[in-house]
C-alpha cells in the first residue's frame, strides 16, 4: 500500500504543478487587457476563446486533483493500523494537499471572475465603438454604461455564491477528516483486541456482566410491578 500512496502523491504534485501553469496563463489574460476604449471586437473574441479553453482545462485539473486526494484519504484510512499510515507525517501530508486544493479552488474562482468581468467589459466597449461609428445609432452607445453596472452586480452575486460554495467544501473536508480519524481509531481498537487476547476477554466479560445486570434489574422491576398490582387489587 505504501507504493500506492507514493504513486498517488507524485500524481498529486504533478497535477498541482499543471494547475499552477494554467492559473498563470489565466491571470495573463487580465494583464494583457487593453484597458482603453479602442478595442477590436475580433481581439476580444479571440481572448474569450482562450479564456473558455483555459478555464475548462483548470476545472478538469481541479476535479482530477480532488479525486486523487480522495484516493489518498481512502488508502490512508484503510491502512491506518499499518506502521507507515500511522506516521503523523502521513496525516500532515493529507492535510497539506487538501489545503493546496482549497487554495487552488479559491484562486481559480477569483481569477476566473476577474478575467470574465474584464472580457465582458471589453466586449461591451468594442460593440459600443462599432456602433458609435454610425451616426444613426450613436445614441445607443449610452445604454452600455447601464449594462456594465448590471454586469458588475451579477459578478458580485457570483462571488457571494463562490464564498458559500467554498464554505461548504471546507465543511465537507472537515467531515471527511473526522471520518478518517474515527476509522483509524476503530481499526486500532480492533488491532489491539486481536493482539492482546486478555483485553478482548476482559471486554467480553464486561459485556456479559452488563447483560446479566440488565436481566436482574428487569426481573426486579417486573416483580415489583406485579406485587404492586396485586396489592392495589386486594
Curated annotation (Swiss-Prot):
Vesicular side: 234
Topology relative to the membrane: Single-pass type IV membrane protein
Record's keyword annotation contains Magnesium: no
Coiled coil region boundaries: 54-121
Localisation per UniProt entry: Golgi apparatus membrane
Keyword entries, A-Z: Coiled coil, ER-Golgi transport, Golgi apparatus, Membrane, Protein transport, Receptor, Transmembrane, Transmembrane helix, Transport
UniProt GO molecular function: SNAP receptor activity
Listed GO biological process terms: endoplasmic reticulum to Golgi vesicle-mediated transport; inter-Golgi cisterna vesicle-mediated transport; protein transport; vesicle fusion
Transmembrane segments: 213-233
GO annotation, cellular component aspect: cis-Golgi network; Golgi medial cisterna; Golgi membrane; SNARE complex
Covalent S-S links between cysteines: none
Cytoplasmic-facing ranges: 1-212
Matches recorded under InterPro entries: Golgi_SNAP_su1 (IPR023601)
Short name of any one Pfam family annotated for the protein: V-SNARE_C
Source organism, top-level taxon: Eukaryota
Its job: Involved in transport from the ER to the Golgi apparatus as well as in intra-Golgi transport. It belongs to a super-family of proteins called t-SNAREs or soluble NSF (N-ethylmaleimide-sensitive factor) attachment protein receptor. Cooperates with ykt-6 for proper expression of Golgi-resident proteins. Required along with ykt-6 for normal embryonic development, seam cell division or differentiation, and ray formation.
Similarity section: Belongs to the GOSR1 family.
PANTHER family given in the database record: GOLGI SNAP RECEPTOR COMPLEX MEMBER 1, GOS-28 SNARE- RELATED
Assembly notes: Component of several multiprotein Golgi SNARE complexes.
Stated name of the protein: Golgi SNAP receptor complex member 1
Amino acid at each position: 500500500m505504501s507504493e500506492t500512496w507514493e504513486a498517488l502523491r507524485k500524481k498529486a504534485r504533478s497535477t498541482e504543478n499543471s494547475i499552477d501553469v494554467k492559473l498563470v496563463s489565466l491571470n495573463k489574460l487580465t494583464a494583457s487587457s487593453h484597458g482603453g476604449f479602442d478595442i477590436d471586437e475580433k481581439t476580444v473574441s479571440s481572448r474569450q476563446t482562450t479564456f473558455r479553453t483555459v478555464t475548462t482545462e483548470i476545472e478538469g485539473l481541479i476535479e482530477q486533483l480532488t479525486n486523487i486526494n480522495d484516493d489518498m484519504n481512502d488508502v490512508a484510512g484503510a491502512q491506518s493500523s499499518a506502521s507507515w499510515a500511522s506516521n503523523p507525517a502521513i496525516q500532515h501530508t493529507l492535510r497539506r494537499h487538501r489545503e493546496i486544493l482549497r487554495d487552488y479552488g479559491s484562486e481559480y474562482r477569483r481569477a476566473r471572475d476577474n478575467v470574465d468581468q474584464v472580457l465582458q467589459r471589453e466586449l461591451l466597449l468594442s460593440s459600443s465603438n462599432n456602433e458609435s461609428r454610425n451616426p444613426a445609432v450613436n445614441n445607443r452607445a449610452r445604454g452600455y454604461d447601464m449594462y456594465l453596472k448590471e454586469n458588475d452586480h451579477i459578478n458580485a452575486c457570483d462571488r457571494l455564491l463562490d464564498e458559500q460554495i467554498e464554505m461548504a467544501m471546507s465543511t465537507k473536508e472537515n467531515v471527511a477528516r473526522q471520518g478518517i480519524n474515527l476509522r483509524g481509531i476503530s481499526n486500532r481498537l480492533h488491532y489491539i483486541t486481536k493482539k492482546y487476547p486478555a483485553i478482548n476477554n476482559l471486554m467480553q466479560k464486561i459485556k456479559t456482566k452488563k447483560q446479566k445486570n440488565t436481566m436482574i434489574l428487569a426481573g426486579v422491576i417486573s416483580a415489583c410491578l406485579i406485587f404492586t398490582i396485586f396489592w392495589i387489587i386486594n
